[in-house]
């Protein structure tokens, strides 16, 4: 997994400004950080496609967009790596912001499913804005691997340290 910046109060404000307020300058910072993270990963790995972590349906409705997919777009275009969206929420999950490691794991256990008709082959990389405990990325990778999709890593804009 590669990330561009450590999660800090400033990074938190930028992520929230992008996610919740559609602040264009914040969007640019997040998508640039994801692009930089992918560039670092590409030095060591061949990547066939990017898979953004999907937002909860309620969050997508509220924001009016699929945030991570949109933030991954510039990296996809720059490196000519297609975005694929086979991950779906198979059940309702709570907002993770107030949960500890065990709470996040319990919240996400079995939460993702894969659209079986996608037929993806090759090396996939997950994309998210922030990794705090790794629970989201672990659960997404589990669902994808169960569906036969090879996940070789993940890129995020920010990394919380220590992982909570």
Regions found by a protein language model. Give the residues of each.
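Active-site-facing substrate-recognition patch
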Residues: 1-49, 56-77, 83-121, 158-164
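Short glycine/serine/threonine/alanine-rich loop segments
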Residues: 80-81, 149
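Structural beta-sheet core signal
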Residues: 85-86, 126, 153-156
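A phosphate-binding catalytic loop at a beta-strand-loop-alpha-helix junction
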Residues: 126-140
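PRPP-dependent phosphoribosyltransferase catalytic core
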Residues: 138-164
């Amino acid at each position: 997994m590669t990330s561009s910046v450590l999660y800090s109060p400033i990074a938190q404000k930028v992520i929230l400004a992008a996610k919740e307020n559609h602040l264009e300058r914040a969007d640019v910072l997040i998508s640039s950080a994801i692009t930089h993270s992918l560039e670092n990963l590409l030095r060591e790995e061949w990547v066939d496609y990017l898979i953004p972590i999907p937002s909860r349906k309620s969050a997508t409705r509220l924001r009016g967009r699929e945030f991570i997919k949109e933030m991954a777009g510039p990296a996809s275009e720059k490196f000519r790596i297609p975005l694929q969206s086979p991950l779906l929420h198979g059940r309702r999950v709570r907002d993770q912001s107030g949960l500890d490691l065990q709470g996040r794991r319990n919240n996400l256990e079995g939460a993702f499913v894969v659209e079986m008709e996608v037929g993806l082959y090759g090396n996939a990389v997950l994309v998210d804005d922030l990794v705090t405990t790794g629970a989201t990325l672990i659960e997404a990778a589990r669902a994808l691997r169960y569906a036969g999709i090879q996940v070789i890593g993940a890129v995020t804009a920010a990394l919380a340290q220590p992982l909570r």
